[in-house]
C-alpha cells in the first residue's frame, strides 16, 4: 500500500509537477484509509484488465466528494461502476471508457444535411458529480445535449443504470427541427434504452431535477429518497397518444429514430465481453458491490 502511494505520488510529480503531487499526497493523508483503498483497487483493476497503470485523473476522482456524499459511499459507487465495465465490456470499449476516449453509438443525418453523433464520453468537469460517463448528442459545432450516468447494482448482482441531469444547449430547438422534430432528450434516452436492453438492466433511476416533466413523459414513477424509477422501455413512443400528437411528422421522425435505435443497439452489442463457456452470453461480474 505504502509503495503504491509513493509510486503514484511520483507519477503525479513527473506528469503534472510538484504542486499537484503535493496536493495528491495531502489529500491521501487526509482521506486515509479510503484513498489507499481506492488507489489500490483502481490500480489493480487497470493492471489486470489493461496491463497498465490507472490514469491519474481516475485516481484523483476517487478522492473527490461530489454531491456531498461520504468518501466510503463515493468509492463504493466507483467500484461498482468499474466492476461492471470490467466484467461486461470487451477490451476496446472498456479501454475507451476508462481512458477517456469517445465510444461511438450512432450517427444520423438531419433534414438539412448536418450529421449528428450519439456517443459515450467522459463527463465535462461540471457534470462529474452526476456520473462517471455521459451520453452526448453532438455535431461539428459542439455538444447539443448530454446525460451523465454510471453503472451500478441493485439488490445484489442485478445491474442498474443511474442517470444524472439532462444538459441541453440553447440550440436544441434548431437541432430538433433538423431532426424532423425528434426531441434531443429522446435521442439520449434511446442510448439509455440500448444500454439497458443489451446489458439486461433491471433498474433505471434518476434524481429529481428540472427535467421532471420529461421523466414523467418517459413513464417514470417516484420512489422514496427523491428519485424517479424509469421503465426499461420507451413509453411515449409506443402509445397512440404519441403518434397522434406528432401528426404528419410521425413517419420521418420515426424513421430517424429507428435508425438511431438500430445503430445504438448494434453498437452496445459489439461492446460486450463474451465468454464462450457461457454459450455467447455476456460475462457476469467477478465481484459484486451492492450499492444504490
Regions found by a protein language model. Name each.
Residues 1-159, 166-175, 194-292:
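Terminal substrate-recognition subdomain of acyl/acetyltransferases
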Residues 176-194:
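Conserved acetyl-CoA-binding loop-helix of GNAT-fold acetyltransferases
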Amino acid at each position: 500500500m505504502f509503495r503504491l502511494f509513493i509510486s503514484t505520488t511520483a507519477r503525479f510529480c513527473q506528469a503534472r509537477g510538484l504542486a499537484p503531487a503535493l496536493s495528491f499526497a495531502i489529500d491521501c493523508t487526509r482521506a486515509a484509509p479510503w484513498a489507499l483503498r481506492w488507489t489500490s483497487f483502481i490500480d489493480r483493476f487497470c493492471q489486470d484488465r489493461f496491463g497498465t497503470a490507472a490514469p491519474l485523473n481516475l485516481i484523483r476522482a476517487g478522492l473527490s466528494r461530489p454531491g456531498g456524499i461520504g468518501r466510503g459511499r463515493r468509492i463504493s459507487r466507483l467500484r461498482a461502476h468499474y466492476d461492471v465495465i470490467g466484467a461486461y465490456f470487451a477490451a476496446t470499449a472498456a479501454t475507451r471508457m476508462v481512458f477517456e476516449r469517445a465510444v461511438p453509438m450512432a450517427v444520423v443525418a438531419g433534414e438539412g444535411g448536418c450529421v449528428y453523433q450519439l456517443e459515450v464520453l467522459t463527463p465535462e468537469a461540471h457534470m462529474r458529480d452526476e456520473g462517471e460517463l455521459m451520453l452526448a448528442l453532438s455535431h461539428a459545432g459542439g455538444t447539443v445535449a448530454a446525460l451523465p450516468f454510471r453503472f451500478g447494482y441493485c439488490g445484489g448482482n442485478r445491474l442498474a443504470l443511474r442517470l444524472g441531469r439532462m444538459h441541453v444547449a440553447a440550440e436544441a430547438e434548431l437541432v430538433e427541427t433538423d431532426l424532423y422534430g425528434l426531441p434531443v432528450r429522446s435521442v439520449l434516452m434511446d442510448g439509455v434504452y440500448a444500454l439497458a436492453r443489451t446489458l439486461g438492466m433491471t433498474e433505471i433511476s434518476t434524481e429529481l431535477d428540472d427535467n421532471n416533466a420529461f421523466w414523467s413523459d418517459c413513464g417514470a414513477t417516484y420512489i422514496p429518497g427523491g428519485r424517479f424509477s424509469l421503465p426499461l422501455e420507451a413509453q411515449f413512443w409506443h402509445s397512440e397518444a404519441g403518434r397522434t400528437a406528432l401528426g404528419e411528422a410521425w413517419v420521418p421522425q420515426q424513421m430517424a429514430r429507428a435508425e438511431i435505435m438500430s445503430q445504438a443497439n448494434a453498437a452496445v452489442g459489439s461492446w460486450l465481453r463474451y465468454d464462450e463457456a457461457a454459450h455467447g452470453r455476456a460475462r457476469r461480474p467477478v465481484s459484486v458491490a451492492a450499492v444504490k
